[in-house]
């Protein structure tokens, strides 16, 4: 029956030693990943937050097209923020700020082992550039009221900063049933966006050990492209991690799981939360993850900010099917009430009408 086991003098002692060896190997890989790879510095946005010249032909094209008689010219995403310097004065210009860059830089710098003088310099230069570039636009749109208040403090001029959340397709959320689970955990997001990598690393290195120590058995399925050697090392320290890749129907895939949002970095709206709600899947998030979205602890979700608290929230939710159903249904109701596609479209149109 034990064809694969070698003959040993003390079989039970040998099995015990194998378990110790397996545990030690996982712990060794955790240490290698944590300390030999400076992942934060590799992927942080600090060095890409200062001005970088645009291709000359592209800049010339934008300059020409923008003078073609538009009523409103709208620019989105931080890599294009410098276009404001090219746009003509006689037109209403808008920058849609999906994520406040200096806030993200501040968040990422808190996870460095040591902040160098050069990094402090880059942070200040980037923050000054962001401030100046935003001043070149007549109006700024952010996705949450939290970001609006931050920008008011940052650049002033309250009347030109507007809130217009992202439009969230509701699909067939109302028709779905909540499918409770006792072990299946999911996360949505690509490795290329560093806040996602930080979230998965934090889960695997800090939260997962807390789950194991309490005897909780689980699978952790991560949706999106994850291919680097860092992630393969991470799988060795967290065997519960399953890299799913692309899924055809995200909402059907998430249904029947507990969605995790262990996000510690960034600003704006976390679309992964809205995907969870549209999937009728209950979710556990950090305060940062749900920031700016009008969901509350114990009402639409569970919120926890330390590894131990996050693990405890996961175990509690996995063990309470009624709570899963309650949170998922109440989150859908809140989403429909506050973030229905038509309401969001009307809100954006109201901003445009106000500007014109």
Summary of predicted features, one role per range:
Residues 297-308, 316-321:
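Conserved acidic donor-binding segment of nucleotide-sugar-dependent glycosyltransferases
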Residues 13-72, 78-81, 113-136:
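Conserved nucleotide-sugar donor-binding subdomain of glycosyltransferases
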Residues 87-111:
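Active-site proximal beta-strand in glycosyltransferases
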Residues 138, 254-268, 279-282:
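Acidic donor-binding loop of glycosyltransferase active sites
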Residues 163-255:
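Conserved catalytic-core segment of nucleotide-activated headgroup transferases in glycan assembly
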Residues 102, 120-123, 131-173:
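Donor nucleotide-sugar binding/catalytic pocket of nucleotide-sugar-dependent glycosyltransferases
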Residues 322-353:
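A charged, aromatic-enriched C-terminal amphipathic alpha-helix characteristic of glycosyltransferases
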Residues 272-276, 282-286:
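Short hydrophobic beta-strand element within catalytic cores of glycosyltransferases
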């Amino acid at each position: 029956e034990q064809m694969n086991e070698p003959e040993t003098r003390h079989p039970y002692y040998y099995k015990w030693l194998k378990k110790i060896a397996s545990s030690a190997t996982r712990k060794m890989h955790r240490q290698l990943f944590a300390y030999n790879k400076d992942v934060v510095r590799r992927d942080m946005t600090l060095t890409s937050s200062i001005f970088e010249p645009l291709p000359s032909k592209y800049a010339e094209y934008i300059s020409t097209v923008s003078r073609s008689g538009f009523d409103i010219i709208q620019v989105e995403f931080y890599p294009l923020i410098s276009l404001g310097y090219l746009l003509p004065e006689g037109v209403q210009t808008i920058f849609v700020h999906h994520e406040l860059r200096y806030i993200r830089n501040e968040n990422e710098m808190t996870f460095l082992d040591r902040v160098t003088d050069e990094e402090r310099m880059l942070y200040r230069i980037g923050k000054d550039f962001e401030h100046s570039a935003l001043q070149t636009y007549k109006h700024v749109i952010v996705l949450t009221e939290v970001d609006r208040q931050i920008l008011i403090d940052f650049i002033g001029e309250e009347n030109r900063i507007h809130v217009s959340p992202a439009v969230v397709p509701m699909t067939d959320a109302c028709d779905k049933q909540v499918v409770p689970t006792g072990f299946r955990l999911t996360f949505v997001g690509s490795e290329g966006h560093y806040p996602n990598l930080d979230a998965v690393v934090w889960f695997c290195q800090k939260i997962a050990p807390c789950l194991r120590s309490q005897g909780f058995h689980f699978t952790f399925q991560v949706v999106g492209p994850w291919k680097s050697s860092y992630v393969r090392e991470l799988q060795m320290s967290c065997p519960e991690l399953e890299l799913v890749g692309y899924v055809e129907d995200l909402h059907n895939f998430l249904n029947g799981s507990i969605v995790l949002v262990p996000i510690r970095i960034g600003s704006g709206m976390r679309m992964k939360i809205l995907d969870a709600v549209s999937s009728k899947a209950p979710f556990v998030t950090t305060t940062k993850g749900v920031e700016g979205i009008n969901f509350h602890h114990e009402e639409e979700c569970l919120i926890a900010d330390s590894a131990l608290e996050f693990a405890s929230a996961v175990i509690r939710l996995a063990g309470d099917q009624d709570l899963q159903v309650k949170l998922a249904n109440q989150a859908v109701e809140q989403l429909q009430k506050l973030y229905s596609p038509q309401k969001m479209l009307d809100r954006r149109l109201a901003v445009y009408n106000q500007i014109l």
